[in-house]
A protein has these predicted regions:
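Ribonuclease/tRNase effector modules and their secretory precursors
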Residues: 1-94
Length: 94
């Protein structure tokens, strides 16, 4: 996979989400137990968005889109308790 992101958005994301940068968040795609879902709420006629929940030191929630054969990171943050529960319950390995 080839990743890209907007550098200004990445800096904003770090400030907003406890230092979680996109260069760190891309590691979520290495998690074989990750959960990926289509984001119906935020997708548009011109852009499909996806959510992925996976483990990178802690459970992360990452939003991305596919653009020109690249995975473009839109946002990344620590998963909420509900999202973490979904991740752990899906594989029952707590």
């Amino acid at each position: 996979m080839v990743f890209e992101w907007d550098n200004k958005k990445n800096e904003y994301n770090k400030k907003k989400h406890d230092g979680i940068g996109f260069e760190f968040a891309v590691r979520v795609f290495l998690d074989e137990k990750r959960i990926e879902k289509y984001d119906y709420k935020h997708s548009t006629a011109t852009e499909d968005r996806w959510n992925v929940i996976g483990m990178v030191d802690d459970v992360l929630f990452v939003v991305y889109t596919e653009r020109d054969d690249k995975t473009r990171i839109i946002s990344a943050r620590k998963a909420t308790q509900e999202e973490s529960d979904e991740y752990y319950d899906n594989y029952d390995f707590r």
